Amino acid sequence: MKTLPGVVLSWFGPPASAYALSFATSRLGSASLSRLVIVSNRVPVPDAAGKGTAGGLAVALREAFQTYQGIWFGWTGRVAAQPSPEPRIVDKGGMQYALMDLTSLDRQEYYNGFANRALWPTMHYRVGLSDFSRADYAGYLRVNRTFARALAKLVLPSDLVWVHDYHLIPLAAELRPLGLTNLIGYFHHIPWPAPEVLGTLPGSTDILRSIMDFNLVGVQTERDADNLRRALIQELNAAPQKEDVLDADGKSICVKSFPIGIDVIDFQKVAARPRPNRILGQTIAGLGSRKLIIGVDRLDYSKGIRQRMEAYEHFLASNLDQRGQVTYLQIAPTSRSEVPEYETLSRDVNETLGRINGSLGEPGWVPIQYVTSSYPRSLLAALYRLARVALVTPMRDGMNLVAKEYVAAQDPLDPGVLILSKFAGAAQQLTGALIVNPNDKLEVAEAIRDALRMSHKERVIRWQSMIGPLRDRDVSWWATAFLKELAAQQRTTATYPN
């Protein structure tokens, strides 16, 4: 197996850094160091206080990047009338960022359009919500081409390039004709659907062809990997070679699952020592002797928030003795407000919320507390630890790190209960959760009842069965495993027209 070329992996803090540093030392010796080039749709540049975006991808990758000599390339999130074709280089916190602005048309076609109105719903099995536009698809390809031209000038021959998520699937196909033979990896954070579902999207065959220009494609679960392999075989006549490797059109690609993790030890520390916080204090005071049920999701139709509220309503209707004894806190920061489907979702959720609270609420008790603002990581950790039950019931989800954070945040002596959708990637690892079908409101309602009634002994046993695997496959394991596999691949030898 090839050694990892120049990759220093001591980025995650103890004890993960001890393993990572040992790995780097044993594999590299005195070899000259190359860089890691991370590419993502949005770049979480730290603010003046040193804080960056709190999204799951940003947190996971920042952990990897902090002690690494490399570049993080992507969109600033801003639009400009005439953005520069060259990236703006920013050095902050010992890290280097290469930042691109987009035009308003770019944002509409690339981001709001094809990425989030066509790819996103299709990847989440919501083909009825997919809205394909040739103009949007052209804009999606155009922005990837613009990014590739800017990025190619920054990449050194020995660099490892790590591309993230569905916005940037064509990026390697745009980089190769510019002369890049580097090892380029891609990690797909959301579900990869069955070939029959992906095939409903116009342009899906071209998407698969562009995938072949990566050396390694990582997905969250083995089910996702199998779906992608089957699609490549069916649509491109790809020929399986050795394990996980397929050849098509003179190119070779490795497809493997790498379930993303969290920094378990750090999250446990944050949850165990909560900072004084007004919201936390008010929540504790407002609960009194009631048990807390919590849900934390970005407001998205894939998360099943409305269906979850209706299941909770069914639970209250079927368990009259629980009225006034529990409170369900749903934190759902709004997102993608410029996409019509999200405006519709917001109205639907608010109507459901109003109906439930209006029909079941009592003086001094509101069944559902609903918050649309983002909470900092430290506050979320404290709320997870406070909650007896977590409802993580997406209709589809690549992984769902909230489920893992909830488990990590628990008091080992008095843990809560995780209710988890069978369609979340995390369900493959967190088998100690109460696994449910989010489409079955009765099943979810019964799981809520069972979770609240569960004995202390069973809660501890279930939690212990989950925390070990989380520690074993944390975010350090994820990044190390992916980059090690990428470095083991053969460099690209295919020829491309200029």
Give the ranges of each region predicted by the language model.
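Catalytic cores of carbohydrate-active enzymes across secretory and cytosolic contexts
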Residues: 11-12, 18-498
